[in-house]
Amino acid sequence: FRHQMTREVAAACEGAFAAGCEDLLIKDAHDSARNLIPAELPERVSIFRGWGSDIHSMMSGIDASFAGAIFTGYHSSSNTDASPLCHTMNLDNVSIRINGIQASELVINTFAAALYDVPVLLVTGDLGVCEQAKRLCPAIYTVPVSRGCGNGSISIHPAEAVKRIREKAEMAVAD
């Protein structure tokens, strides 16, 4: 899974660069925050690994200097049947709500970006999280690469996922 996640992140970076992005900071933000394989990422990126000391958790390092955010490899929130990985921040959280809204990592991280007026341009991951992204922001670009099926998932081919992510990242950044 590390190699595929790294390929998907690299594809998003390549699409962003193709659209004219000059600077990219990758926040490795799943589990140990040391999942991505840096040597397999584009040489022009910077990568933030591990957990920062600020309150933004998965969005550590964000500030008003960012023109946009891309979320790759996201999954549905806890209390859903949309992904076998569904949880919010950690497996101990049964449910997180903000103003009565089921708050997935997508919602929490979108709000963190909004604190600095940074738009979320693209979300990739399971179908459930992509549908939630569209409800949250109808103009957002999404790439569903899998869909939940009980305790399993059905995914598109890994190479097709990479292709779609690169294409949509370029479109999202250019837009």
Summary of predicted features, one role per range:
Residues 1-14:
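Short catalytic helix/loop segments, enriched in acidic residues and glycine
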Residues 29-30, 72-78, 127-129:
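Short glycine-enriched loops at secondary-structure junctions
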Residues 31-44:
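Glycine-rich loop at the start of a catalytic domain that most often binds anionic cofactors/ligands
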Residues 41-62:
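A glycine-rich helix N-cap at a beta->alpha junction
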Residues 46-49, 139-147:
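Short hydrophobic/aromatic-enriched beta-strand-loop microsegments
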Residues 57-60, 150-158:
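Short, charged, surface-exposed secondary-structure boundary motifs
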Residues 91-116, 125-128:
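Active-site glycine-rich loop that binds ribose-phosphate moieties when present
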Residues 161-175:
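C-terminal accessory domains and tails appended to enzymatic cores
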